[in-house]
Structures are given as C-alpha cells and as structure tokens.
Amino acid sequence: MNYIVTHPGSAHKDDFLACSVLAAEFAIPIYRRDPTEAEIEDPSVFVVDVGGSHDPERLNFDHHQFSSDHPPTCSLSLVFRYLGVYDDAVRFCPWMKTAEWLDARGARQTAEWMKVDPFVVAQLSSPIDFSLLRYFAEEQELSIHHPIGALMARIGGDLLNYLRSLRRNLNELSNCVEFWKIADLEICYLPKIEGMSADLSSALTMFVREQDRDIAGTVSPDKRGSGFGMTRFNDDRRLNFTQIEHEADVHFAHKQGFIAKTSASDPERLKHLLAQSQVL
C-alpha cells in the first residue's frame, strides 16, 4: 500500500481515526486533498472519507454516497470492516456506535437515539478531540514521523492492539475458565496458568459479559500478589465480601463489599470463602 488520501478542510473523528488505523497498520503517509480519478481507481492507494465510493478491493472507503435510510456508518466503520475487526469494535468499544451516529446523523438525531438531551452530547465533547482534529486539519501531508502523524499511528495502533489482543484473550479464556455452582450462585473461575499475561485476567469481565449465564461473581489470579481476587459481577448484591473480612487468609475486603483479595489458592478454600460471602 502506497499512501492514504483523505479530504482537505475540517476533520472529523471518523476520518481521523480511520487514517490513524491505516497509518498504524501499513506505516504509510496521509495526504489531505481531493483524490484524483487515478487514485480512486488505484488499488494501492487508500481513499478515505472522500471520493463517493465504497469499494474495498480498490481501497475506497467513503460513506457519504449511502442513502439516508442506510444504517449509520462512518469511514472508520468501513476501514474496521476491511481489517476484520468491526464486529469486535462494536461489541467492545462502547463509543463506536455513537461515533457512527454522530457522523452519519448529527448531534440531534444521535441524542434522540441515546434518549438524552442534545446538550448532553455537547457535554461529552473533549478539548483533546478539538485540538487534535484542528491540528490534523491544518496539515496537507503527514508521515508517521510527523508529530501529528506519529501520534495518529500510536492511537491507531492502540486501537488495533486492543481489539486483536482482546479477541485472542477471549478465545483463550473459553478454553480455560471454569463455572462453579456455589449454592444457587454461579461463579466464573480463572485458574492460574503458567506464563499467563495480565491481559488475560483483565479480559475476564468482557468474557463473562459475553456469556448467556447468570454470573454473580468472578475469581481470578491477583495481579498484585500470589493469591486470588474475588469480585462481584455487575455489582451483584448476592455477594458481600465484607462477610469474610476477618478470615485469616483474606488480606483485603472492600468496605462496599464488591471485592476481596485472599492468599488462598486451593479451589475448595476459594469455594468456601465464596459460600461465606453469599447474602442469604
């Protein structure tokens, strides 16, 4: 892939992020100008958010030609689909659908979709967004060595790394977690695994959210110690870990009852502590 062409003038979050992701993936420069007809036809040039065409084989990723009743779509949606991470982006990035709505429908319709006052959408805006988009819009050419181009590549790389590593971790978790029945509660347990990365434990909440099960809590290796952490899932009040705060092998129990840390590692002992934590 040779380079990216996107429109000149004001920039929006979707074209900024779409270009960031492509710059990270292919280490190529960005040109902010109208594309030529030759570039639109060239399968080695990414044409993003301009050009009136969505044709992944020719690397065309514009959405402005879609009909008014087309599902909200932005240039980032199209680039994510091209890279095979769109479904996970929608699933695991809560801001993704909002970004699509804002770009395709505007703030007022987005507010109606979110069931909030339009002013709330403005309240969620960030001065970081404003400055980055302005700096991006001021440039005509950005290589990955340009200060803004380098930052964009870092942002795009972070996005792709998050989505791809999360998918790997979720696939791995499906092969190693256990589901315990503690009285009438179901608990998701992640055992210690040799060489396990901290990211695997961090993905446990996402994994549980994907399950069609009534999970009350999780048990996973403590990132800061040798024992385990026990946590309510979705703040499930059927568990209250203050009920085990005086146990000798429990060195921390939050006063709000949603988490506890224990030096215990034997599964039977962990199950016993969970049973003691159940609110009857």
Regions found by a protein language model. Name each.
Residues M1-Y3, D42-F46, D55-R58, D184-L185:
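Short coil/turn segments at beta-strand junctions that form active-site/ligand-binding loops
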Residues M1-I4, Q243-E245:
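Short, hydrophobic/aliphatic alpha-helical segments
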Residues V5-V45, G52:
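N-terminal ordered "arm"
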Residues G9, K13-S20, E41-S44, S68-T73, ...:
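C-terminal accessory domains and tails appended to enzymatic cores
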Residues V45-F130:
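A basic- and aromatic-enriched beta-loop-alpha substructure that forms the phosphate/nucleotide-
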Residues R33-P35, H63, S220:
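Conserved beta-strand termini and adjacent loop/short-helix elements that scaffold enzyme active sites
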Residues N2, E25-P29, G84-V90:
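Short helix-capping/linker segments at secondary-structure and domain boundaries
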